Amino acid sequence: METTVKVALGALALLMGASLLATRPNSHANDSATPTKAHLRLASLSTEDRRDVDYALLDQRLRMLMTKPAMVGMAVGVVENGRITFLRGYGETLAGSGEPVTPDTVFRWASVSKGVAATMVAKLAEQGKIDLQAPVANYAPDLKLPAGNENRATVGDLLSHRLGLYRNAYDNKLEEGQDPSFLRQTLVQLNPTCEPGTCWSYQNVAYDASSEMVSRTTGLPYEQAVRRYLFNPIGMASGSVSLAGLEGSRSWARPHTVGKRPLPLVDTYYKVPGAGGINSNIKDMALWMEAQMGEMPDVLDDGVLNTIHAPYVVTPSERGRLRKFLERLGTAWYGYGWRSYDYAGHHIVGHRGGINGYRSLILFDPQKKSGVVALWNSNTSQPGGLEFEVMDMLYHLPFRDWLELNKTAPAETALETEPEIGSGDSAPARKRSKG
């Protein structure tokens, strides 16, 4: 089953074709009673705007994807030329329930949440409340690194995973139920892998020091700060940073594992909200992407966006994780809470996430102000390829079956399918003037 947002129906039908908006007899359409910024921006589309994405083909590909055994529910959004041009839900919130995923269905973002924390810190830095070049100890006293490195590692080093720790340090202890604040204090017991700022290694427990510094700087709990300074001004009404926020949503997707078996909800990574705590529906994720493209300068100006999207460290092993795309994928970098890539000569920015029955992705071209977001509620990573199919449409590149829909089964254990939560890699850092 699938649903669409029927907003400004006549204008959208002209833009994407009546077939994209038509409701099939066995589908469930969703019409939101209260207009949101997403609705308003959809309604403002001009039929004269150039469209590079073939939305009929995209919808066909997504329908094919949903026939795969591991898929339960999914929501996808596309922004083109700075405006939302596609919002659609597919499948079910819970396998066998008959409850459809709609553009209003809330999912978990997992590690795509890191971009929210980095954006929040960079916004505070622009206001002069945080110095990105100052020692992280100045703002997050709970973080104690080996050899006293909290006094040498900068805030920028924290946001770009250059703290000199082995990858995913103490994730296992976090998953055992230990308190993340306590764990950050005990990182001092580890052996350093390098001097801060000189190598890269993905973190969750340590990275969440970002939420501590936001709370200490604003005087607000992290969720309230994010809501006040980011979600409310952007118009992200469904955005939340807690398990209660997810479960309290009118429509929310339940997590599933292999065989469409439901998984229990756990709050482990909500305890490190800067690393993996965000929830929202696909509408609001698309609005978030618009803001990251510079379309809401009153909320996020070019100074903040340039700071967080800049490529601070080369991550060659990311190319290993994404090796099936190497025909077009060049250098991979990490910025502040964001990955970036050279793809067919274009600089693109994004992130993936995965946690306990949820997966997510965001990828966009800041120059073209175009990109894609997706959320789904199963442990399969096969949709990781959708973003590159959309990019190929935007760049008018020859079609490649990046979704591997012609394969009988996806290679679920391949490196490129690893989620961002609980996975990472190490690489030498490239020193820059910022960071």
Q: What are these regions, as identified by a protein language model?
A:
Residues P103, R108-V112, L124-Y166, Y170, ...:
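Active-site helix/loop module of the DD-peptidase/beta-lactamase fold
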Residues L87-Y90, N168-L174, V241-G245, G384-G385:
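Short, solvent-exposed loop/turn and secondary-structure capping segments
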Residues V53, L57-M64, S111, V116-M120, ...:
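Extracytoplasmic/secreted proteins, especially bacterial periplasmic and envelope-associated proteins
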Residues S181-T193, T257-Y270:
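The feature captures the short pre-catalytic strand/loop hairpin that immediately precedes
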Residues L65-A75, G96-L158, C194-V205, P273-G276, ...:
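Short active-site loop at a secondary-structure junction
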Residues D54, L58, T105, L132, ...:
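Residue-level signature of the cytosolic catalytic core of signaling kinases
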Residues E2-L87, T218-R228, N232, L263-G435:
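Catalytic loop of the DD-peptidase/beta-lactamase superfamily, centered on the K-T-G motif
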Residues S44-R51, V106-R108, D142-P146, A169-L174, ...:
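Second-shell loop/turn segments in exported
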